[in-house]
Amino acid sequence: ISPLLALADSVTGALEGGADIHVTAGELSGTAHASLDNVTIRKDETRIEGVSGRIDLARLMPPLTRGTQTLSARRIIAGTELLAPTLTYRIEASPDGPLPRLAIEAARVGIAGGSVSLLPTHIDANRDDHDIDLDLDGVDLKTLMDLIAVEGVSAEGQLSGRLPIHISRDKVFV
């Protein structure tokens, strides 16, 4: 499925898939699919628990998905606990170049007593800059400040609203 799984300390759960691969005149083509059911990946102190969903590639090179797909997990532990992350997406051809783009229709995660959602957007491998909008709902500021642990910074209350973010190759602007 991914060479990155070889870097994990452990992978458990049900994972099955298949591929139809063709090589013609040195060009790789074909399709592939994978189903994940309650897959947990561990690496050191980081865990992604309960990943479920189906990945269905209509084309391997460059990769394109067969329609919209959803992946979900029970939780992610990476310095903090992220609850019930979900991602609804497709990988599609880009109008900006030969590499595909990730079209995110919905993404959501529970954090700091609230939730953060990514509004629909495109992440294009052909572009250096991306603008995304996060929708924050009931995120506890004290918990959030404890997570990021910036010395001398504290806050109380809840954070809700839209947060625009601009990402360039080497900078992030909020």
Task: Tell where the protein language model's regions lie, with residue ranges.
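Extended amphipathic, helix-rich lipid-handling scaffolds
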Residues: 1-42, 53-167
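Extended intrinsically disordered, low-complexity coil regions enriched in Ser, Thr, Gly, Ala
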Residues: 47-49
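Mature extracytoplasmic or organellar-lumen-exposed domains after removal of signal/transit peptides
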Residues: 168-172
